């Protein structure tokens, strides 16, 4: 029976970053990463829009994102291509939002600027949608835009590949096509009586039951995203997160292709990652295909449910997203869907950021809430501190964060006031 020092379940971006930082701090640890996929980053990491921003009013969110962006930037600068493009985030806003305290705070906090209605029109965006359509669909006129300049897009497979390359060089073992079905609990000190563990015994996770047999370890870490509930509920542990389906549509037209080179910031001629004012539909430029990836995170109306192989619904696009898009962006009028896919966000509905919890010899990294890529490296550093029992950790770039602030019992995450 092989026994590891640490068994990590989940080879998505959170699991890979956690493994990287734990192994970096503890080079002698014997670590194995399990995943049900045929290789790494095949779950929701692969389906991510993979955009990044440091435009957050919440200091917690800002620390996690800005630290990760700085790390990724340095990795790419040193020669490992992550597909990073600093084409900016463009938040299109009505008059009230543009003049809000949140925007004024951000202009003083992060590298950002305001662009005018005229500049927005030059991008190919209609600032005043048709009045009748606006009345029916609750569309807002655009007064201006907030541009986050230390923001942009990247390629999730390249980021995952960076971590895997480093981990393999450090001797971390990977076991793919290995579905973890159950966490097996046992008494810390066995009496070998039937019915153990009893309520008066200290308990630990002894092993994980998988499709490839049982794996044993001294310590365990779950980075299982929306599947965390399935593993924790049988133990009576609440993950405090829910799965939220997100659909992405790759949309093409001749006019959309022309829009791709219209920029608002950065050295490249590349359209910014853009968020419409209402509904807050995302437009993610894809420089390779010269198409937009279109997505929207629904609130009320989209239930919390989990499908094993989710698909995107083109009727949903036609009846919901397209009707809004053609009013704001005329280039969508003669467009067509070339591809589509769907995934899930692991939503922490308390404050929309990661949750780090420790139960027995089990660490849990959960609730990335759609920000997994942009906060992943910092999340891995917090996970390493949680694993080692440290009270705080110093993130890449020098900022410090308390581990308990991102837990549950002593959670201290300041409210995000830039609501998109």
Residue ranges and their predicted role:
Residues 1-14, 32:
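Beta1/beta-strand and adjacent pyrophosphate-binding region of the FAD-binding site
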Residues 14, 39, 227:
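Conserved Rossmann-like nucleotide-cofactor binding loop
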Residues 23-45:
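Glycine-rich FAD pyrophosphate-binding loop
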Residues 49-132, 280:
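Dinucleotide-binding Rossmann-like beta1-alpha1 core, especially the glycine-rich loop
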Residues 95-203:
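Flavin (FAD/FMN) cofactor-binding and adjacent substrate-gating region
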Residues 118-128, 153, 312-388, 397-414:
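Flavin (FAD/FMN) cofactor-binding core of flavoprotein oxidoreductases
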Residues 210-266:
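Central helical "cap/lid" subdomain
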Residues 257-360:
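Active-site lid/adjacent beta-loop-alpha segment flanking the redox-cofactor pocket in flavoenzymes
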């Amino acid at each position: 029976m092989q026994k590891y020092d640490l068994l990590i379940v989940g080879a998505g971006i959170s699991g890979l970053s956690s493994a990287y930082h734990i192994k970096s701090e503890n080079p002698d640890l014997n670590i194995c990463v399990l995943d049900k996929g045929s290789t790494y980053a095949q779950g929701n990491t692969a389906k991510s829009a993979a955009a990044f921003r440091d435009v957050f009013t919440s200091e917690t969110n800002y620390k996690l994102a800005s630290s990760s962006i700085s790390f990724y930037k340095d990795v790419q600068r040193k020669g490992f291509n992550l597909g990073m493009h600093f084409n900016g985030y463009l938040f299109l806003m009505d008059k009230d939002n543009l003049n809000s305290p949140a925007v004024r705070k951000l202009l003083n906090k992060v590298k950002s600027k305001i662009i005018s209605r005229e500049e927005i029109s030059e991008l190919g965006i209609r600032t005043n949608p048709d009045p009748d359509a606006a009345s029916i669909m609750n569309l807002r006129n655009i007064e201006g835009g907030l541009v986050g300049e230390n923001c942009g897009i990247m390629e999730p497979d390249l980021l995952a590949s960076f971590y895997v390359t480093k981990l393999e060089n450090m001797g971390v073992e990977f076991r793919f096509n290995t579905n973890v079905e159950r966490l097996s609990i046992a008494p810390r000190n066995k009496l070998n009586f039937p019915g153990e563990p009893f309520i008066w015994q200290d308990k630990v996770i002894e092993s994980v039951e998988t499709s490839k047999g049982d794996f044993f370890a001294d310590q365990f870490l779950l980075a299982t995203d929306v599947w965390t509930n399935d593993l924790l509920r049988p133990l009576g542990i609440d993950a405090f997160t829910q799965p939220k389906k997100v659909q992405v549509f790759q949309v093409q037209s001749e006019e959309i292709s022309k829009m791709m080179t219209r920029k608002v910031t950065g050295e490249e001629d590349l359209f910014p990652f853009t968020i419409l004012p209402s509904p807050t539909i995302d437009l993610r430029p894809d420089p390779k295909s010269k198409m937009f990836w279109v997505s929207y995170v629904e609130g009320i109306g989209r239930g919390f449910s989990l499908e094993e192989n989710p698909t995107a619904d083109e009727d949903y696009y036609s009846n919901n997203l397209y009707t809004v898009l053609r009013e704001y962006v005329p280039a969508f009028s003669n467009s067509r869907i070339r591809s589509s896919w769907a995934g899930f966000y692991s939503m922490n509905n308390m404050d929309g950021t990661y949750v780090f919890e420790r139960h027995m010899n089990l660490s849990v990294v959960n609730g990335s809430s759609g920000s997994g890529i942009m906060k992943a490296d910092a999340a891995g550093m917090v996970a390493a501190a949680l694993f080692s029992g440290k009270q705080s950790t110093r993130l890449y770039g020098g900022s410090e964060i308390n581990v308990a602030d991102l837990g549950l019992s002593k959670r201290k995450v300041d409210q995000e006031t830039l609501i998109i």
